[in-house]
A protein has these predicted regions:
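A short, N-terminal "cap"/entry segment at the start of jelly-roll beta-barrel domains
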Residues: 45-122, 126
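Conserved metal-binding segment of the jelly-roll/cupin
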Residues: 1-20, 27, 158, 164-175
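Short histidine-centered beta-strand/loop micro-motifs
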Residues: 18-19, 119-120, 135-141
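Short, flexible loop/turn elements at secondary-structure junctions
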Residues: 11-13, 21, 31-34, 129-134, ...
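Active-site lining segments that contact anionic ligands and/or coordinate catalytic metals
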Residues: 105, 120-125, 133, 143-144, ...
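Short, glycine-/Ser/Thr-/acidic-enriched flexible segments
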Residues: 14, 32, 115, 143, ...
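A short hydrophobic beta-strand segment most commonly corresponding to one strand
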Residues: 8, 22-43, 147
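Glycine- and acidic-residue-biased ligand/ion/polar-headgroup-sensing regions
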Residues: 1-2, 130-134, 138-161
Length: 175
């Protein structure tokens, strides 16, 4: 896991949270904790750390439009890729911006490489790049939106409130 990566922890798949480095880390969890706490459905099990096995999907899905197929069969995994590298998303954004300089919204969607659908079946994840000095008015949407700054800085105005955000800042726009 590296800075800016999107890590999926889908419902029903065992996973652990940890940090082996010495420097501080920001972990932004985007989930339904208020509902889970209200229903008293949250629990955890203290156990041994799992062994990290390299090559469990990260490298199999590194080329756009090309997915592994073993003897003409496709994977039926709901979540074949759990880590989406920020370096790949940033490269895609920069390529998109260079390819179409007039493009107002430089945005990519994190998708399931097997199905083409959203990376997570209950949440949509996007990366949006603003050019220096750009002002962008996003359309109103019914669902709430969470914005997290990975690089640079941005001034976000939501209704009558303005937020000056820098790297690692997060804000939410209610639906």
């Amino acid at each position: 896991m590296s800075r800016g990566d999107l890590i999926l922890t889908p419902t029903g798949l065992w996973h652990e949270h940890g940090h082996d480095g010495q420097d501080p880390v920001v972990w932004l969890d985007v989930l339904d904790l208020p509902l889970v706490y209200y229903m008293e459905a949250s629990y955890h099990i203290n156990g041994q750390r799992q062994d990290v096995v390299q090559g469990r999907g990260d490298r199999q899905y590194t080329r756009s439009g090309v997915v592994p197929s073993h003897v003409f069969e496709r994977s039926r995994k709901a979540y074949p890729l759990l880590r989406y590298a920020w370096t790949d998303a940033r490269a895609a954004l920069e390529s998109l911006a260079a390819d179409d300089p007039a493009l107002e919204h430089v945005q990519v969607t994190y998708t399931n490489p097997e199905t083409g659908g959203d990376a997570e079946n209950i949440l949509g994840f996007y990366a949006l790049m603003l050019r220096p000095g750009q002002t962008l008015r996003l359309p109103a949407r019914s669902p709430a939106q969470v914005f997290h700054v990975i690089d640079g800085h941005v001034e976000a105005t939501l209704v009558d409130s303005t937020f000056n955000m820098v790297e690692a800042d997060t804000c939410c726009a209610p639906g």
